[in-house]
């Protein structure tokens, strides 16, 4: 198994799909990385040479992925909450952020129903 960005990449999958195992790399970015390096999308990871895997590591290293990306996203949310802006307040109260209705629906975001005590 090749190890890229601290993640074990599955050998039996095509390169374009295998790279999506890394948090922060989807199909589009995966295709772009492979195109820049001149590696075919249909090649399986197990068929790549050590040189090509090193090139992949360098290609992925250009982007913010895995722990750094998770930290960046959580810090952005924390910044909104500290500012006290509308989106920050909605995050704090675990409610939808983008104008969806909450009188009905929004159960995923709000969590299970809380019974009213009499």
From Swiss-Prot:
GO CC terms of this entry: cytosol; small ribosomal subunit
SUPFAM superfamilies: S13-like H2TH domain
GO annotation terms (biological process): translation
GO molecular-function terms, A-Z: rRNA binding; structural constituent of ribosome; tRNA binding
Pfam families per the UniProt record, alphabetical: Ribosomal_S13
Domain of life: Bacteria
Positions of the UniProt region annotated as Disordered: 94-118
rRNA-binding listed as a keyword: yes
Record keywords: Ribonucleoprotein, Ribosomal protein, RNA-binding, rRNA-binding, tRNA-binding
Keyword Heme belongs to the record: no
HAMAP family the record matches: Ribosomal_uS13 (MF_01315)
UniProt family annotation: Belongs to the universal ribosomal protein uS13 family.
Cited function: Located at the top of the head of the 30S subunit, it contacts several helices of the 16S rRNA. In the 70S ribosome it contacts the 23S rRNA (bridge B1a) and protein L5 of the 50S subunit (bridge B1b), connecting the 2 subunits; these bridges are implicated in subunit movement. Contacts the tRNAs in the A and P-sites.
Self-association state and partner proteins as the record states: Part of the 30S ribosomal subunit. Forms a loose heterodimer with protein S19. Forms two bridges to the 50S subunit in the 70S ribosome.
This protein's name: Small ribosomal subunit protein uS13
Species name: Vibrio cholerae serotype O1 (strain ATCC 39315 / El Tor Inaba N16961)
């Amino acid at each position: 198994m090749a190890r890229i960005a601290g993640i074990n990449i599955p050998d039996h999958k095509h390169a374009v799909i295998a790279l999506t195992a890394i948090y922060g790399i989807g199909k589009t970015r995966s295709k772009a990385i492979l195109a820049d390096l001149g590696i075919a999308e249909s090649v399986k990871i197990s068929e790549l040479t050590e040189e090509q895997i090193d090139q992949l590591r360098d290609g992925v290293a250009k982007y913010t992925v895995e722990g750094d990306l998770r930290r960046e996203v959580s810090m952005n949310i924390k910044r909104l909450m500290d500012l006290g802006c509308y989106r920050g307040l909605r995050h704090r109260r675990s409610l939808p952020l983008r104008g969806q209705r909450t009188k009905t629906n929004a159960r995923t975001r709000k969590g299970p129903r809380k019974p009213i005590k009499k």
